[in-house]
Amino acid sequence: MFGYVKINKMDLTFREYDYYKAYYCGLCKYLKRNHGEISRFSLNYDITFLIVLLTAVYNPESISTEEVCIVNPFKKKKVITNDITEYAASMNILLTYYKLEDNLMDDKRIKDKLAYYIYKNKLKLAYEKYPEKAEYIKQQLNELNKLEKDKNINIDEVSSIFGNIMGEVFVYKKDENERNLRMIGFNIGKYIYLLDAYEDLDEDFKKGRYNPFIEYIDKNDELKEKVKKIKIGRASCRE
């Protein structure tokens, strides 16, 4: 479901792009060192954006190093990490684990089962550091699963649940930035859910799986209009 929040490389300077890659590599390295090699398979651009955004807001002290990469072991790359990297990595683990747990309620695919039990061993560290966020993510995914089981096709209502999850993830601290960061995360969460549902529509229809857009399977123009009218920006702020 993740991976939709990407940069437009053409709009960045060379220096900006190098820094973006350095934060991405920092997340990758941190996941490997603290949660194991397997955790890097869950690496995504959405969480990298979270690091860049929160770093810009809070300006924590960062460590910049030059390290080799498994993709290119003969050339060192810039790697940037800070306290936000640790937080984002923990959120990445929590989101991946609970999403896999949610998937097992529906499909019970072998690859999901395997990944779930592997990530179960990685969950402890992230849960111990952020138990309230972990419980909130789990509770919201349970609510989402309930709506999906009921075949709820109110896309605004359904996507708002995932918006709530990402809104909570984007709140790093309880301070004056909380409301704005929650709203940004909420909007991004709805955006991710909508795009994922839209892209999966044909496959979900063929396999008889739930999709909130299922009634528009042969109505592409109507579906586009419906998506345009969905209210992005109405967060249910958790204070």
Predicted segments — roles?
Residues M1-M183, K190, L194-K228:
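Acidic catalytic motifs of isoprenoid enzymes
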Residues K231-E239:
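Residue-level detector of conserved catalytic or cofactor/ligand-binding positions
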